[in-house]
Amino acid sequence: MPEKTAVLLLQMGGPDSIEAVEPFLLNLFSDREIIKIGPAFLQPFIARRICRKRAPKVEGYYSQIGGKSPIRELTEAQAQALEEKLGGNFRCFVAMRYWKPTTIDALAAIKREGISRVIALSLYPHYSRATTGSSINELKRVLGEAGARFEVSYVDRFYDHPLYIAALAAKIEEGLAQFSNRSEVELVFSAHSLPQSFIDEGDPYLSHILETVRLVMERLGNVNYHLAFQSRAGPVKWLEPSTEEMIQKLAKGGCKELLMVPLSFVSDHIETLYEIDIQYAEEAKGLGIEHFRRSPSLNTSPLFIDCLANLVHKTVSSE
């Protein structure tokens, strides 16, 4: 009987209760690969002060979307769908970078099943050292500290995979179907922002985002589209334009029909359910945009699961 292979899905994670918001934020702001706050030895203390101040506001956001992030349940559903697609020689596990189940939890579960072969598959389509890079480095750190004997391969990007592009285009078509005349719709790809300094230092994130947009628009054809960046925080220069600025610009130009496309997210969480569905929707309405919609997230889209399965099979066959 062939030896089983573990597929470890790497994701950001999110608080599973209101009480978990502050410790989740602390884990996030303590990671120097995503944000550097002062000298390394001071970052934990500065991060704690920042999180204590930010937590009440962020808790309010989560209280409006059910009191927690759905990202764990959705990622576990993706893992289950992928395992069913791959068949009996594969087992799928989830590792969250900033919450539970942690990387240590996931590796312990893999070890309990007696599996030594692991494919670590990042669920961030577009590589950045702040996201995929941080998750992979955390995995390598845990493996080193544990002295665990796993044979690990890494899938760290899939921004141009044909099945990912097809899945994204299909969801956008679902979104466009909510409008009576697609020629009047302004489509806004909204990607998670990143400090401009990352790009200046050679991070490929922006080039990956631009290529995804190009490939998707090749499929969609004649639709007016724009690219913007959401979720920036702090006083440093971030990628531009921001999603808020783009909405304001389109409204000023007379836009009445707007479809938001969450681009760097493969499942629903705070950025889609609160930022887009509540915050940006309210802003758009106040600016006179009459029909504001969002294309559905990929979640367990069969095309997206096919993409993940293909990435796994390609990794296995290349060894």
Swiss-Prot record:
EC number(s) reported in the record: 4.98.1.1
Catalysed reactions, as listed in the record: heme b + 2 H(+) = protoporphyrin IX + Fe(2+)
Example of a GO cellular component annotation carried by this entry: cytoplasm
Subcellular location: Cytoplasm
Transmembrane in keyword set: no
Record keywords: Cytoplasm, Heme biosynthesis, Iron, Lyase, Metal-binding, Porphyrin biosynthesis
Main location: cytoplasm
Single annotated GO MF: ferrochelatase activity
Positions that bind Fe cation: 192, 271
Keyword Metal-binding: yes
One BP term from GO: heme biosynthetic process
Primary enzyme class: lyase
Pathways involved: Porphyrin-containing compound metabolism; protoheme biosynthesis; protoheme from protoporphyrin-IX: step 1/1
UniProt record similarity statement: Belongs to the ferrochelatase family.
Function according to Swiss-Prot or TrEMBL: Catalyzes the ferrous insertion into protoporphyrin IX.
Protein name listed in UniProt: Ferrochelatase
Source species: Geotalea uraniireducens (strain Rf4)
Gene responsible for this protein: hemH
